[in-house]
Amino acid sequence: MSQPTTIPGIIRNTVANIHPENHTFLLHKVKDSWVEISYGQALEKIDAISAWFLNMGIKKGDRLSLIIENGPNYVYYDQALQQIGAVNTSIYPTLTESEIEYILNDSGAKAIIAGNPFLFRKVLKVANNCPSLIRIIPAFDDFEKHSDKLKLNAGVINFEQLIQEGLGLVEQYRHQINAAREAILPSDISCLIYTSGTTGIPKGVVLTHHNLFQNVVNSLIQIPFVEKTDRFLSFLPLSHVFERTIYHISIYTGAQIAFAQSLELLAKNMEETKPTILCCVPRLLERIHDKAIKNGTSAGGIKTKIFLWALETGKKYRLVNEAGKKPGILLSNQQKIADKLVFSKIKAKTGGRLKFMVSGGGALPKNIGEFFGDLGITILEGFGLTETSPVMAVTERHRVIYGTVGRIIPGIEVAIQNVDTRHIYTIQTHDNFKEDLQTEEGEIIVRGHCVMKGYWNKPEETATVIDADGWFHTGDIGRFYRGNLQITDRLKNMLVNAYGKNIYPTPVENTYLKSPKIEQVFLVGDKREYITAIIVPGRETMQETFGLNNEFFEKTDVFIEDKEIVDWIGHDLRKLSNELAKFERIKAFKVKRNPFSMDDGEITPTMKAKRKVIEKKYATDIDQMYLQETEAD
């Protein structure tokens, strides 16, 4: 069998050349037990679904939508539609009904699978406003009570029933399925991924099989240690391209995929499944860091002393290794003791087999990466956007430089361009890598196999981000540091104060997030005389410190006025302000009772703040901070 060049070719290649059909492919929890699904079992369902869709009249290029949690059903549906040349159009489960309606109509989706009753009801409410939608597929039992009384233009069929009907059609359509799979070209569209964005209407990013496949093979050149014996624990939404890339990499290498039940059960699922690979966002790593520090320092007495000694030992050991030197006998022995007494207990919470974690979807604060490095847990940072398929750069395991996102992957060019003059400071590739390269800061632009085909139905918007020379303008500000790409912030996030000083919120916010008291920081200050912020304290820490019950967080007042709590936060803000330039320091702040959330439309699914939404929503409260300062500096 020739090497694959498209997404549906990957799983067939794995079965032909890496694992037999009876080898475990997927794992998911059913009631109290983890159930293994072999490649053969998965392919049987995948072919059945393909046959059913062909019988329905689905053809190459048709869009088929998903609004479903991670799990085997996502894989079956995705692989089935991909191999007949249809286009995966995933929808974030957290999106509103109006956003779902917009995506279904903009994409012209002909079918949608809904993962649970809540998501099914969302789809039902907008279905009759979507003329192209002809099938709604609930992936759960007892769906009739939600849909029977409704007059729907689209037909409704349970996913399990669809599969059973498809099994009876497979032989009839076997040749057509195989022919459809072979007819897919690398230039054909594989998926539409609608970026929620921090502003405006969602845009459908058009990614081809070439985009996604090349991202897989070239990322693996950078991280060649993903193997067929690995196990990936999936919990970030597969509707996001970052998680989907690791899903593709797992299939390509023959690694198993286990599906976490939920974010709340992630810690338990890690201990149960013992993964070797995990993808996460920086906020999760920050929470693990905060909890570990809190547990280690609150024990008191000799336990706290041992914990702090172990961290210091881990840091010394890491720094020696990073300098390319060999640790001495004394330090090596101390490291073994630190690992036995402290680090091994933290690692055990991950299942004890973790080779590395990949952090993406935002910049990882330098101190968080260093903390995990001190424990002996490798964090590889990746960088990219939905529009870049997504990976542009990823850390090499032998060359971790905290605060950077690694080396450019093969096959693409990345340049740093002056925002005002458009002068290009440097163009870098994987092959011209220089360890000592340091450049000016500017907008990161990229061209090559990773760049999207464009925005669906939006040629003008496509032309604003992909220039005549093929450069995609990411909107991210960064530079090269010690050969690696380093991200500062989003260009559109930049604040320019009343005195003309440029302030990038993300690095400033990350400085204040070093406080274990603080969960979220939202900086304000564009065209203002000084910086202010909305601060969200960590709920658990605040409850323990002030003896608060759950009713406190259910109060209708958005902001906490209690002077004791405000001063408690202010103490850490003043201390951390010393790490910043004076014009970057928070001068006034408000303490928000509950976190910014996706449900309230304040953050994206990748936990990025929707700055314009938040500024508009809390405009009156923000204005008050410029009338009367709550001193933090």
Predicted regions and their residues:
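Conserved C-terminal "lid"/linker of ANL adenylate-forming enzymes
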Residues: 520-523, 529, 548, 570-633
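AMP-binding/adenylate-forming catalytic core of the ANL superfamily
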Residues: 95, 112-114, 448, 453-454, ...
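Structural core segment of the AMP-binding/adenylate-forming
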Residues: 55-56, 79, 83-165, 568, ...
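Conserved AMP-binding/adenylation subdomain of ANL enzymes
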Residues: 213-233, 238-343, 353
